């Protein structure tokens, strides 16, 4: 039903064809980008669905599906948070109007009071899970934690297992951040990563290999050139490093960690903090 304040006219709006309500734990009206929407959650497949009223006069509704990858097994989470009983934690999915955007919030909370927000991650519309960022300002959390970076760590542990042989790490020197635009890399670490790179030869390394470096926290990516130097037989990130350095605001003394995701053939920046519980 709709009510026009100016004309004081009441009209009936034909609702969308919804699936069997018994499949869902929750159905509610909400707001999506200023439009009336119906949200269904809790069908057990790590997803929820929204029907948005596009045109009240024509009774036109659009549908959006938020499919959440099942990366919340919670065993690494329970381990890191030192929770005694994994069964005390449940997954919940909801759309929260307080975000002020058309994003959806996924959170995991204890099944019984007190309800502390254990972690949350915002899922961009039309994803799934294209962008990750924290929702700390919305909730009162019961511990000191940087939510967005902790979520990234959990995903890494689940999807990539954080193989130490696939990580290149370095504390930046003055030479790394000066105007020459080169990052000198630890030789042994690069050699370890090269074992997982396809079709890499000494000749191609001398010429330079173009690689992608992804910042999954900010949803940015950079194109860099990995090269070996003939004179010293060591490795550098050459072209592209300067742009990446300035974009990330890296300074002398900062640590940079790059994880080689050999399945997707790209580096992932691991610059997150490990301070979980005081």
Curated annotation (Swiss-Prot):
<dbReference type="InterPro" id="IPR003340">
    <property type="entry name" value="B3_DNA-bd"/>
</dbReference>
<protein>
    <recommendedName>
        <fullName>Putative B3 domain-containing protein At2g21920</fullName>
    </recommendedName>
</protein>
<feature type="DNA-binding region" description="TF-B3">
    <location>
        <begin position="168"/>
        <end position="275"/>
    </location>
</feature>
<dbReference type="GO" id="GO:0003677">
    <property type="term" value="F:DNA binding"/>
</dbReference>
<dbReference type="GO" id="GO:0005634">
    <property type="term" value="C:nucleus"/>
</dbReference>
<dbReference type="Pfam" id="PF08268">
    <property type="entry name" value="FBA_3"/>
</dbReference>
<keyword id="KW-0238">DNA-binding</keyword>
<keyword id="KW-0539">Nucleus</keyword>
<dbReference type="InterPro" id="IPR013187">
    <property type="entry name" value="F-box-assoc_dom_typ3"/>
</dbReference>
<keyword id="KW-0804">Transcription</keyword>
<dbReference type="InterPro" id="IPR051442">
    <property type="entry name" value="B3_domain"/>
</dbReference>
<dbReference type="InterPro" id="IPR015300">
    <property type="entry name" value="DNA-bd_pseudobarrel_sf"/>
</dbReference>
<keyword id="KW-0805">Transcription regulation</keyword>
């Amino acid at each position: 039903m709709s009510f026009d304040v100016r004309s004081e006219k009441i009209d009936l709006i034909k609702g969308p064809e919804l699936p069997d309500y018994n499949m869902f734990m929750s159905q509610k009206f909400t707001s999506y980008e200023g439009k009336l929407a119906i949200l269904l959650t809790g069908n057990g497949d790590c997803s929820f669905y929204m029907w948005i009223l596009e045109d009240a006069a024509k009774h036109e509704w659009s549908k959006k599906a938020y499919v959440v990858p099942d990366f919340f097994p919670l065993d690494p989470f329970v381990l890191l948070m030192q929770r005694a009983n994994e069964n005390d934690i449940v997954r919940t999915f909801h759309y929260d109007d307080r975000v002020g955007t058309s994003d959806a919030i996924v959170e995991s909370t204890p099944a019984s009071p007190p309800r502390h927000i254990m972690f949350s991650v915002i899922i961009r519309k039309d994803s799934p899970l294209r962008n990750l960022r924290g929702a700390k300002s919305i909730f009162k959390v019961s511990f000191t934690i940087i939510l967005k970076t902790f979520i990234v760590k959990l995903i890494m542990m689940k999807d990539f297992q954080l193989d130490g042989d696939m990580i290149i790490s370095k504390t930046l020197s003055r030479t790394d951040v000066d105007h020459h635009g080169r990052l000198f890399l630890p030789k042994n670490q690069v050699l370890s990563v090269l074992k997982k790179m396809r079709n890499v030869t000494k000749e191609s390394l001398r010429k330079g290999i173009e690689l992608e470096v992804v910042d999954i926290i900010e949803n940015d990516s950079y194109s860099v050139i990995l090269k070996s130097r003939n004179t010293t037989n060591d490795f550098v990130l050459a072209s592209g490093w300067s742009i990446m350095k300035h974009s990330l605001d890296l300074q002398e003394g900062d640590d940079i960690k790059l994880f080689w995701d050999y399945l997707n053939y790209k580096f992932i920046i691991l610059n997150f903090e490990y301070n979980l519980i005081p």
